[in-house]
Amino acid sequence: MNKALFLCLVVLCAAVVFAAEDLQKAKHAPFKRGAAGAAPCFCPDKVDRGDLWMFRGDCPGGYGYTSDCYVWPNICCYPH
């Protein structure tokens, strides 16, 4: 019984370590909606649509965004 519990503990620890490693390798963990990309959003002063990022204070870097507007508690980032 003790060996089985020890083995379960080792497997659980290994799973946690590998899961944490995968999260560290990720460039960014966005709350970007939609299976094919972000949900569309529209700002009052823009003609085209932007990308809706949920629960963020600013647009993430590395995606080429140059402007934004707040759709509380989310942010709409441009250009698409």
Swiss-Prot record:
Weakly expressed in the ectodermal tissue from the distal and proximal tentacles, body wall, and oral disk. Residues 1-19 form the signal peptide. Residues 20-31 form a propeptide. Coiled coil: none annotated. One of its GO terms (cellular component) is extracellular region. Disulfide bonds join 41-76, 43-69, 59-77. Keywords: Cleavage on pair of basic residues, Disulfide bond, Hypotensive agent, Ion channel impairing toxin, Nematocyst, Neurotoxin, Potassium channel impairing toxin, Secreted, Signal, Toxin, Voltage-gated potassium channel impairing toxin. It is found in: Secreted; Nematocyst. Belongs to the sea anemone type 3 (BDS) potassium channel toxin family. Blocks Kv3 voltage-gated potassium channels. Reduces blood pressure. This is Kappa-actitoxin-Avd4i. It comes from Anemonia viridis (Snakelocks anemone).
